[in-house]
């Protein structure tokens, strides 16, 4: 809410109460049409893609992701997940739906003993390389430093440039809960 009590985000088709409820539940923030930073927040790498989401949720935790997915299901809105915002086809954004921006989930934890790294969904190759190179480790990805890790991972596995064990994945399924799936 603004100082004068008006909704901070134009509510459009979603309604004020559901958006306010989501905003209170999140550790991250919400950006909507009409806000000063909306135009910048909705941009993706491919300038030919000009979509206007109803909301952009800047997730600060995996719980924010789960809550946003549950919210989108409840209000019947499509979602797009943005990691590095490098989808040439525009899959990291949507018109009139909800974009879950993972940029803040960019931590990288390196286990030197096993020579593995666990990276957040918003990690870019620049962040990943800096974390792994500190331990003398390198990877087969990262052709463009601002590209999100998810952008290349499926292609690299297809070309057998990555180890078949692959990364750990934390899918968000029917229930608004976080599940952890790993290869070991």
Residue ranges of each PLM-predicted region?
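N-terminal accessory segments
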Residues: 1-165
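Active-site and channel-lining beta-strand-loop segments
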Residues: 108-109, 166-184
């Amino acid at each position: 809410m603004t100082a004068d009590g008006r909704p901070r985000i134009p509510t459009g088709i979603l309604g004020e109460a559901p958006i306010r409820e989501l905003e209170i539940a999140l550790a991250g923030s919400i950006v909507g049409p009409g806000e000063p930073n909306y135009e910048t927040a909705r941009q993706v790498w491919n300038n030919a893609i000009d979509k206007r989401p109803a909301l952009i949720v800047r997730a600060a935790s995996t719980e924010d992701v789960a809550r946003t997915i549950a919210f989108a299901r409840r209000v019947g809105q499509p979602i797009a997940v943005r990691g590095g915002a490098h989808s040439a086809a525009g899959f990291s954004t949507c018109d009139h739906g909800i974009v879950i921006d993972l940029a803040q989930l960019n931590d990288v934890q390196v286990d030197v003993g096993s020579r593995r790294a666990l990276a957040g969904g918003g990690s870019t190759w620049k962040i990943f390389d800096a974390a792994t190179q500190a331990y003398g480790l390198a990877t087969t990805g990262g052709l463009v430093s601002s590209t999100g890790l998810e952008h290349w991972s499926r292609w690299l596995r297809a070309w057998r440039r990555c180890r078949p064990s692959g990364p750990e994945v934390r899918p968000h399924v029917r229930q608004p809960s976080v599940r952890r799936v790993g290869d070991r």
